[in-house]
């Protein structure tokens, strides 16, 4: 980033993410790299760029949007699960390396969120029924719905508060 254009960053939210739903043995190395580049390498690069100014100021907050896929695997999302698992560990590592400088790094690991990435799993079937995975999510979620991107605003805002030191 160009510091003169955006100024000093106190709070960084690494929220970019992509997914390619391809069985691992059908996925090319380039497709795997594309997912890892966006979901893991980009947060590393951006965090690395802002941490020195956070150290200089004596504080900073980094919030990484991870995924429940950092904890479990599922068919056709090997690159995504690997990248989000790596992001979870990068989050922990940033805490270990830079916590002494009052830089807090937290990860939010949401479940399934209704985004363009999950649209294929929410589409109605030709017979009008729900996609089997959509039925599964609805039946296993206490709110009986997919999460919305707005659902992440509260946790992110909480973690960004200056009073919070976790």
Predicted regions located by residue number:
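Alpha-helical segment proximal to the catalytic Tyr-Lys
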Residues: 52, 96-100
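Active-site loop immediately N-terminal to the catalytic Tyr-X3-Lys motif
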Residues: 22-26, 72-78, 100-101, 144
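C-terminal helical subdomain
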Residues: 107, 131-164
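Residue(s) in the substrate-gating loop at a strand-loop-helix junction
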Residues: 67
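Substrate-binding pocket helix/loop in short-chain dehydrogenase/reductase
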Residues: 23-24, 31-36, 137
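Conserved small/polar residues in nucleotide/adenosyl-binding loops
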Residues: 1-4, 164-166
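Active-site helix of classical SDR
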Residues: 47, 83, 91
């Amino acid at each position: 980033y160009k510091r003169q254009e955006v100024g000093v960053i106190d709070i960084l939210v690494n929220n970019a993410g992509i997914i390619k739903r391809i069985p691992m043995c059908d996925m090319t190395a380039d497709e795997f790299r594309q997912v890892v580049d966006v979901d893991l390498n980009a947060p590393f690069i951006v965090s690395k760029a802002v941490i020195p100014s956070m150290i200089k100021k004596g504080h900073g907050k980094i919030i990484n949007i991870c995924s429940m896929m950092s904890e479990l695997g599922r068919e056709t999302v090997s690159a995504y699960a690997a990248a989000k698992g790596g992001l979870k560990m990068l989050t922990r590592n940033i805490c270990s390396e830079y916590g002494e400088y009052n830089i807090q790094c937290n990860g939010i690991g949401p479940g399934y969120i209704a985004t363009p990435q999950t649209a294929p799993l929410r589409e109605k079937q030709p017979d009008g029924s729900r996609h089997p995975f959509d039925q599964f999510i609805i039946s296993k979620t206490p709110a009986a719905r997919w999460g919305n991107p707005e659902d992440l605003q509260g946790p992110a805002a909480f973690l960004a508060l200056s009073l919070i030191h976790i």
